[in-house]
């Protein structure tokens, strides 16, 4: 016994190695091009996605991406590796959607169907997907996705949207 030989408690520390799957759900609708203070939402989305992706790669996790507008535009299956990560970031910067609208429910449904095992998912959006009365259209799909995956919502907005400037 090591503790008896050393005459002090011997503690062995193990670090859990787990391979998470990280999926970025990126809103590529027309509204992402808006921006008044320095950068557009598109630039902010790319920066946030890059930070999350690099963090995942450092932890040896798989990273995938799902681009959506009012439909799923593109799905990049989760993989490991720096070249895969750079491919995702390049796609976020250069991708041109075929539709203008936003349907968060469609993206969440696709996520729950495409990724069977529990994953860490990040929804990067301006969350401008509401009914005429202002209620979110994605509420039910969000509940289903949260039950299956660890879902974090990162709302990207322009400061001008929160406070309308007094122009007279």
Question: What are these model-derived regions, one by one?
Answer:
Residues 113-117, 131-168:
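Von Willebrand factor type A / integrin I
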Residues 77-80, 99:
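A general boundary/transition motif marking the beginning of the first structured unit of a protein
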Residues 63, 83-84:
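Non-catalytic regulatory/linker segments of enzymes
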Residues 84-119, 131-132, 158:
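Von Willebrand factor
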Residues 79-82, 166-168:
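Short, flexible, mixed-charge acidic loops at enzyme active sites
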Residues 1-78, 120, 125, 132, ...:
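An amphipathic, basic-hydrophobic helix/alpha-beta surface used to engage anionic
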Residues 48, 103-106, 136-137:
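Short, conserved clusters of charged catalytic residues that mark active-site
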């Amino acid at each position: 016994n090591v503790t008896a030989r050393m005459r002090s408690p011997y503690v062995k520390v193990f670090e859990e190695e787990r391979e998470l799957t990280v999926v970025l759900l990126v809103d590529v609708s027309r509204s992402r091009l808006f921006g008044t203070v320095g950068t557009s939402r598109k630039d902010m989305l790319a920066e946030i996605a890059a930070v999350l992706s690099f963090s995942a790669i450092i932890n040896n996790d798989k990273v995938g991406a799902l681009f959506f507008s009012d439909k799923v535009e593109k799905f990049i299956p989760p993989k490991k590796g720096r070249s895969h990560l750079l491919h995702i970031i390049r796609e976020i910067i250069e991708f041109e959607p075929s539709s203008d609208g936003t349907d968060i429910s469609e993206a969440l449904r696709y996520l729950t169907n495409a990724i069977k095992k529990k994953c860490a998912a990040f929804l990067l959006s301006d969350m401008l997907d509401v009914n005429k009365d202002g209620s979110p259209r994605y509420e039910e799909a969000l509940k289903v996705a949260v039950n299956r995956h660890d879902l974090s919502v990162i709302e990207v907005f322009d400061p001008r949207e929160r406070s309308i400037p007094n122009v007279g």
